[in-house]
């Protein structure tokens, strides 16, 4: 494990964008695999528009995992990297960069800025990757956005305080993605128990796809 992390550190210095892309995609894929294996979707847990033949038969949904990897590696890895670099510049002008007040400010900017906007962006991307239009994205946002955001605020602010305080900049996206594996699995389970519009919808952020 130590040697693997050392290899990751070396590649991060030599090829930072490619390394972040591969690692983020892999962790998103792992999150989707764990969610599907622990809490498989069936016809009673998804709306009719999301029911494929494989889902109806209770089979593992490979395209869903592929979409998770594609979104993580080709979209979110670059957005997340730029966002964390931007957050390091967010600070009060009269306070040292490492002052506790700046850490609180960064968490507030992250949770009140990125989180509310990241959800509709994610649902829009997933709808396109699934072959649906923006109408499906609007439906997902209407059903899932507020409850998902409230749950997000119960989990991520505390982690981000630790992330911004103790984790080096180059590892913050990795740390967030590792925690997101457990976050997606937990959120998938809790929200699959809540009936929405006559169906049970699995809600995940960010970002395990369905």
Curated annotation (Swiss-Prot):
Name under which the protein is recorded: Protein SYM1
Presence of keyword Membrane: yes
Native source species: Candida glabrata (strain ATCC 2001 / BCRC 20586 / JCM 3761 / NBRC 0622 / NRRL Y-65 / CBS 138)
GO biological process, one term: ethanol metabolic process
Superkingdom as given in the UniProt entry: Eukaryota
UniProt membrane topology term: Multi-pass membrane protein
Keywords: Membrane, Mitochondrion, Mitochondrion inner membrane, Transmembrane, Transmembrane helix
Pfam families xrefs: Mpv17_PMP22
Transmembrane segments annotated in the record for this chain: 22-39, 68-84, 112-129, 173-189
GO cellular component assignments: mitochondrial inner membrane
Function: May be involved in cellular response to stress. Required to maintain mitochondrial DNA (mtDNA) integrity and stability.
Family: Belongs to the peroxisomal membrane protein PXMP2/4 family.
Subcellular location: Mitochondrion inner membrane
């Amino acid at each position: 494990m130590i040697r693997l992390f050392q290899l990751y550190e070396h590649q991060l210095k030599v090829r930072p964008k490619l390394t972040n892309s591969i690692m983020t995609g892999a962790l998103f894929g792992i999150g989707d695999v764990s969610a599907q294996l622990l809490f498989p979707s069936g016809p009673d847990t998804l709306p009719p528009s999301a029911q494929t033949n494989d889902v109806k038969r209770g089979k593992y949904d490979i395209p869903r995992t592929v979409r998770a990897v594609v979104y993580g590696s080709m979209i979110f890895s670059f957005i997340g990297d730029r966002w964390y670099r931007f957050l390091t510049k967010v600070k009060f002008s009269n306070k040292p960069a490492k002052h506790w007040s700046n850490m609180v400010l960064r968490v507030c900017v992250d949770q009140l800025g990125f989180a509310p906007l990241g959800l509709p962006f994610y649902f829009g991307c997933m709808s396109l990757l699934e072959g649906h239009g923006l109408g499906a994205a609007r439906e997902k946002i209407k059903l899932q956005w507020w409850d998902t955001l409230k749950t997000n605020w119960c989990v991520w602010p505390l982690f981000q305080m630790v992330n911004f305080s103790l984790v080096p900049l180059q590892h913050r996206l990795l740390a967030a993605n590792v925690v997101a594996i457990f976050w997606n699995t937990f959120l998938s389970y809790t929200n699959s128990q809540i009936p929405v519009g006559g169906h049970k919808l699995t809600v995940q952020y960010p970002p395990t796809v369905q």
